[in-house]
Amino acid sequence: MNFFRNILSSVMKSTRRFNRFGLKSFGKLHKDINKAVESVMSTSGEVSSMVYAEHLLKLIEDQNDDRLIKFLKNLLVNYDIDTKRLIHDVKIYASEKNEQNLANVNASSEPKWVELFRRLNSTTNGTYRLVKLRERIRLLKDQQLKTFDSGLLNLFKYWFNPSFLVLEKIDWETQANILEKIIEYEAVHEINSWDDLRARLAPSDRKCFAFFHPLIPNDPLIFVEVALCKNIPKTIEEIIKIDRNEIDPEDANTAIFYSISNCHNGLLGISFGNFLIKKVASNLKKEMPHLDQFQTLSPLPGLIKWMEKYAPITFEKCSDKNCADDELMKQTIRYLTESNRKDGMPNDPVARFHIGNGASLERINLNADKSEKGLDQSYGIMANYLYDLDIVEENHELFFKDKIVKTSNNIKSLKKKH
């Protein structure tokens, strides 16, 4: 990571130098945001383009919501695809299929505003700032702006390709500003204090790993928390409580992935988690060959809403706190193994992620999460998903072929029973 940080430092110094030089040497920097766009798009010089882009991105960030919506809609009109040119280029290519004519079709089929965002990416911290811009666009909930939402997502899929990402271990010695981000971004089991965080990072039987992008080195994209265990825990309290007995990692036989948090809403739609879990599991296996199981302890965030619609009698009983464990187990198995979706994917979003990633449903745990959040979303029920590294890719392929959730013998037995 130091190598990437050195490169980043060099790039940022150059950008700031260009910007200082540019303010003196490249003429007027327009306060009118639409004229500022023209300056960025009409400039061919690399340095001047960076200067104008820096100025424009600052103007965009300073717009209030109404002005931002107006600006983006103008951008959509004035820098859209030139359809006449596209039709012309397609006709030329149809009559003579060669490399240059194909390149012309590719160029004319892309909206001009896409190139604008590429140029904005060259600014100081441009990648991060565009991620925040997409996050803001999504919050505006304007249907016409969905074009920019999807357009930025397509760019991010290139810029955040997994081959560019760096896996870093997070521990109690990690720099404080990153630890603060871990507290802020934890999305599954809230971290309420520094003591709480220390209990998850400091003990030798607790691990945390994060993906970083070289251009955003101090802000994780996604992180996973791991517990090394002798036995498979049935409750989240066993894992995250502060006053517990630490075990020697050499005595552990199981790694439990108990929390996976995506850190930026501006990157929604890019799946980092599947690469992260498999990478971490592979690394842990190399580091600690005695680990023979990799499982999750996962929430069921959609269970109660599903039950209200598809198992209303059980829902009413549970609402009155008059629901037997057998009935809860029966409906939970239905929820996790039988799809009510048109696409045939699992009902539960966490199950969709893990099953689609090649894991299998191993166990269902009643009374596993007694936090307010856990009770409100799933009556405290959690699930274990097993990652068998030898067949995880095979499972992935089979699932997307036939949409059948692979389950353990225990789950199969319970399903027959109920």
Regions inferred by a protein language model and the residue ranges of each:
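Extended, composition-driven regions rather than compact fold-specific motifs
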Residues: 1-270, 274-418
